[in-house]
């Protein structure tokens, strides 16, 4: 009753679509050249081999965490889904060089909102790989995950995963 009185009783959708945060080539999680991601130690997901240097929000929600080294962003949807967008592999070692973060922790975002710009050539030359993992970090709280095996994906437009949360 109190939730209704104070406007916090809105129905939260359990289903959510995750869109491509980068434009490029879809990579199955098992094919990401890093065992932490490929063996799903951090959760279920996919990768993208980007063809341009801009990351957009793959979901509507809020920015939960901007890593100090600018190479990764954590997002959280209203239904509890937690998503990590990790730009490249071993990019933490670049210490923020080549990245420009466009959001702050706590910011509300919609699908397609720009999050980070990065120098694709710099990362390609200075990191292990530009393949960028997108991981559902609370996979254990999902009732179902359906990943569409796409080839080419377009940031903010191509639906890559449907998730139903518990």
Swiss-Prot record:
A Pfam cross-reference name: PTS_EIIA_1
Alphabetical GO biological process terms: phosphoenolpyruvate-dependent sugar phosphotransferase system
Kinase listed as a keyword: yes
Keywords: Cytoplasm, Kinase, Metal-binding, Phosphoprotein, Phosphotransferase system, Sugar transport, Transferase, Transport, Zinc
InterPro entries recorded: Dup_hybrid_motif, PTS_EIIA_1_perm, PTS_EIIA_component
Cofactor comment text: Binds 1 zinc ion per glycerol kinase EIIA-Glc dimer. The zinc ion is important for dimerization.
Cofactor(s) the record lists: Zn(2+)
Compartment annotation: Cytoplasm
Residue ranges of domain PTS EIIA type-1 in the record: 34-138
GO cellular component: cytoplasm
Keyword check for Cell wall biogenesis/degradation: no
Positions of Zn(2+) binding: 71, 86
Site (Important for phospho-donor activity): 71
Modified residues (Phosphohistidine): 86
An MF annotation (GO) of this entry: kinase activity
Location of the active site: 86
UniProt superkingdom: Bacteria
Chief place where the protein resides: cytoplasm
Self-association state and partner proteins as the record states: Heterodimer with glycerol kinase (glpk).
Function, as annotated: The phosphoenolpyruvate-dependent sugar phosphotransferase system (sugar PTS), a major carbohydrate active transport system, catalyzes the phosphorylation of incoming sugar substrates concomitantly with their translocation across the cell membrane. The enzyme II complex composed of PtsG and Crr is involved in glucose transport.
Free-text comment about domains: The EIIA domain is phosphorylated by phospho-HPr on a histidyl residue. Then, it transfers the phosphoryl group to the EIIB domain.
NCBIfam families: PTBA
Name the UniProt record assigns to this protein: PTS system glucose-specific EIIA component
Lineage: Bacteria, Bacillati, Bacillota, Bacilli, Bacillales
